[in-house]
């Protein structure tokens, strides 16, 4: 029975970015080290890179502070973006019409794992 914890997670819920756009950013950093992922996300032009950056940094901080894992050995083991609730709005159009506007939200989850722990 191993009592040592080798992974930590962080979740951002109800983020105002579409899940499809968030997944596009997440796919670029999945499997990379935390430091490399943060460098990529810091300069990525996509709007979804900011919330993903915050979740990755939070997961790394959780691993470091809650479980005593070394930040330099952390790797993004899993990352995904689920669909949150959709806010529905109306955009008035000509001649009394109205178009539906769907403002989609995401739940972004990142799991970081100690590379040394997964090698054992």
Curated annotation (Swiss-Prot):
Xref: InterPro entries: Ribosomal_uL22 (IPR001063), Ribosomal_uL22_bac/chlpt-type (IPR005727), Ribosomal_uL22_bac/org-type (IPR047867), Ribosomal_uL22_CS (IPR018260), Ribosomal_uL22_sf (IPR036394)
GO CC terms in record: cytosolic large ribosomal subunit
GO molecular function terms noted in the UniProt entry: rRNA binding; structural constituent of ribosome
Record GO biological process: translation
Listed PROSITE patterns: RIBOSOMAL_L22
Domain of life: Bacteria
CDD domains assigned to the protein according to its UniProt record, in alphabetical order: Ribosomal_L22 (cd00336)
Entry keyword set: Ribonucleoprotein, Ribosomal protein, RNA-binding, rRNA-binding
Cross-referenced PANTHER family: CHLOROPLAST 50S RIBOSOMAL PROTEIN L22-RELATED, LARGE RIBOSOMAL SUBUNIT PROTEIN UL22M
Its job: This protein binds specifically to 23S rRNA; its binding is stimulated by other ribosomal proteins, e.g. L4, L17, and L20. It is important during the early stages of 50S assembly. It makes multiple contacts with different domains of the 23S rRNA in the assembled 50S subunit and ribosome. The globular domain of the protein is located near the polypeptide exit tunnel on the outside of the subunit, while an extended beta-hairpin is found that lines the wall of the exit tunnel in the center of the 70S ribosome.
Family statement: Belongs to the universal ribosomal protein uL22 family.
Assembly with partners or alone: Part of the 50S ribosomal subunit.
Protein name per UniProt: Large ribosomal subunit protein uL22
Organism: Corynebacterium kroppenstedtii (strain DSM 44385 / JCM 11950 / CIP 105744 / CCUG 35717)
């Amino acid at each position: 029975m191993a009592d040592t914890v080798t992974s930590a997670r962080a979740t951002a819920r109800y983020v105002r970015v579409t899940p499809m756009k968030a997944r596009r950013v997440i796919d670029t950093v999945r499997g990379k080290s935390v430091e490399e992922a943060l460098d990529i996300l810091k300069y990525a032009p996509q709007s979804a890179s900011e919330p993903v950056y915050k979740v990755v940094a939070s997961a790394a901080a959780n691993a470091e502070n809650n479980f005593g894992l070394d930040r330099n050995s952390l790797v993004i083991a899993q990352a995904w973006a689920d669909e949150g609730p959709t806010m529905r709005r109306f955009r008035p159009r000509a001649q009394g019409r109205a178009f539906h506007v769907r403002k989609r939200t995401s739940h972004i989850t990142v799991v970081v794992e100690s590379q040394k722990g997964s090698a054992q």
